Curated annotation (Swiss-Prot):
Membrane-crossing residue ranges in chain numbering: 1-21, 41-61, 87-107, 115-135, 147-167, 186-206, 226-246, 260-280
UniProt-listed Enzyme Commission number(s): 3.6.1.27
Organism: Porphyromonas gingivalis (strain ATCC BAA-308 / W83)
Note: Bacitracin is thought to be involved in the inhibition of peptidoglycan synthesis by sequestering undecaprenyl diphosphate, thereby reducing the pool of lipid carrier available.
GO molecular function annotations of the record: undecaprenyl-diphosphatase activity
Functional summary from the UniProt entry: Catalyzes the dephosphorylation of undecaprenyl diphosphate (UPP). Confers resistance to bacitracin.
Subcellular localization(s) per the UniProt record: Cell inner membrane
Gene encoding the protein: uppP
InterPro entries, A to Z: UppP
Pfam families referenced in this protein's UniProt entry, alphabetically: BacA (PF02673)
Annotated protein name in UniProt: Undecaprenyl-diphosphatase
Family of the protein in this entry: Belongs to the UppP family.
Assigned keywords, A-Z: Antibiotic resistance, Cell inner membrane, Cell membrane, Cell shape, Cell wall biogenesis/degradation, Hydrolase, Membrane, Peptidoglycan synthesis, Transmembrane, Transmembrane helix
Chief place of localization: membrane
Catalysed reactions, semicolon-separated: di-trans,octa-cis-undecaprenyl diphosphate + H2O = di-trans,octa-cis-undecaprenyl phosphate + phosphate + H(+)
Length: 280
């Protein structure tokens, strides 16, 4: 993989990771256009540059992640409740993460096989686009933006759909899950960003470990520049993408993303029917 190819893939990652449009589908198209061979390192690279995207969330929402005020309702209720309230966001993220950890571990081999099918990605991308045309009507936005522990768990269950249906988009699944729980578009999107941090960090570390087992430390030394550049570019682009997405989603809803998904999914299907070789 060249530096230029790494930069292009990182731009695609940064633009699509937090939008409900399937970063996997876009990576397939980008790799196909550039003629990037789907080696074990390339597959690892597309996961490991998620670390840059994770950092963009931590930077943009640093006050939410790294400030630990006691909730007013917990003041004077004892040290236990005050402690729990300080880390309320972390407890909710932990609860939301549990379903994906359990199901991902139990069905890891099956998930890997599904993820390796470009047809599955393309069809799910296309059908998910049709569904998104109706999301705003199915789950009317609410001003009740508070996320409770049960709501966090349900959103975590929705995240599992993206694990078993590559091409669905983790962002789409969790945001729709939040709206189904009567959260506002903004609250649902922001919790989706927050949940991406432990989810994607876990996936990145797991992929790095597997790559290490396969090629040892030398494979990281050999591709250090590509990995570093990829993460920096993904970080910068994701910063802009998140800011754009929050404003656009709050104002216009999901329909535009639905049409876009249909277009991209349809393009993948046409390319494969035309005999173009594509790989995840």
């Amino acid at each position: 993989m060249t530096i230029l190819q790494a930069i292009v893939l990182a731009i695609v990652e940064g633009l699509t990771e937090f939008l409900p449009v399937s970063s996997t589908g876009h990576m397939i198209i980008a790799e196909g256009i550039m003629g990037v061979e789907s080696t074990s390192f390339v597959r690892a690279f597309t996961v490991m540059i998620q670390f840059g995207a994770i950092l963009s969330v931590l930077v943009l929402y640093r006050k939410r992640f790294f400030c630990f005020p006691v909730a007013p309702r917990a003041l004077g209720q004892g040290k236990g409740k005050e402690f729990m309230s300080r880390f309320d966001l972390y407890w909710k993220l932990l609860i939301a993460l549990v379903p994906a950890v359990i199901l991902g571990f139990l069905f890891e081999d099956w998930v890997d096989r599904m993820l390796g099918s470009v047809w599955v990605v393309a069809v799910v991308l296309f059908l998910g686009g049709i569904f998104m045309l109706f999301v705003d009507k199915l789950f009317a936005s609410s001003d009740r933006g508070e996320i409770t522990y049960p709501k966090a768990f349900v959103i975590g269950l929705f995240q599992c759909l993206a694990i078993f249906l590559p091409g669905l988009s983790r962002s789409m699944a969790t945001i729709v899950g939040g709206q189904q729980q009567k959260l506002s578009r903004k609250a649902a999107a922001e919790f989706s960003f927050f949940l991406a941090v432990p989810t994607m960090l876990g996936a990145t570390l797991l992929k790095a470990y597997k790559l290490y087992k396969e090629g040892g430390i030398e494979i990281f030394r050999e591709h250090m520049t590509v990995l570093l550049v990829g993460n920096i570019v993904a970080f910068i682009v994701a910063l802009a993408a998140i800011k754009f997405f929050i404003g656009f989603l709050t104002r216009y809803g999901f329909k535009a993303f639905g049409y876009y998904r249909i277009l991209v999914g349809g393009l993948l299907i046409v390319l494969m029917l035309s005999g173009v070789s594509l790989a995840v």
